[in-house]
């Protein structure tokens, strides 16, 4: 009997370790759970979706069924039935999409309730484009071919040249990096250099498909040379103290709020959103001399099903009403001659 209980406990611990990307979680601790099988004690609002249905402009929602941690599809928004505009948006401003859509629909009421948008990382959105707009999440597979795609300006230019996107590339705002930490900053992280310290657990964007990783690498090298970048993205990945995220704008704050990581580099806007949402998150500023700037841009996808709608959104995205929404989260309007990407 004791052997079977021990095996069950080990299996439970192994599962918890696997789902958290190699970071050991307190949930596997029999002392914390009083040696009993219990439902998690997590606060429901720690888990996405964090907008409580606001990032969905569907007019008829039918039966509501959202279960944080289990059934939520937090990066897929709107009604897939018959959209009049499909947007693939690099997820760095998922939180700004609801007010942007509301303003767009106010200006263009014919589109009310007819937008569908996705906010997974830009590299993964390209994979979806290459798959004909088809994606599978959990047990569900659907197809939503994009009308417009949004990412860093350099990537947009690259895909315009390759023929995937139609010219012109439309830049609209810029963003800078910050270090996101739990509200009480228990690891006392004060700078990028601190991220190389042994024992500091990091949640970092994956260079394979998250464009922010390029800017982070540049910032780390400015702060501590190649040695710091290697420590964060090579040495600490190898020893398990850096976990690479799949969707940094969802996972980094989630890991921090659960105590699974001590810090992670994100866009400043993402930390501001978490703070405005009242989550137990704060940030550590990165000096301008060490920081990197991203230029956000978009373009119509070649062969878009709704080219008129795509052009309307691309015109709207750098209008004054749209820029005012972006500025709530620390974005700055793009000005010609700005450097970044």
Question: Each predicted region: which residue ranges?
Answer:
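Phosphate-/polyanion-interacting regions in eukaryotic proteins
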Residues: 117-118, 149-150
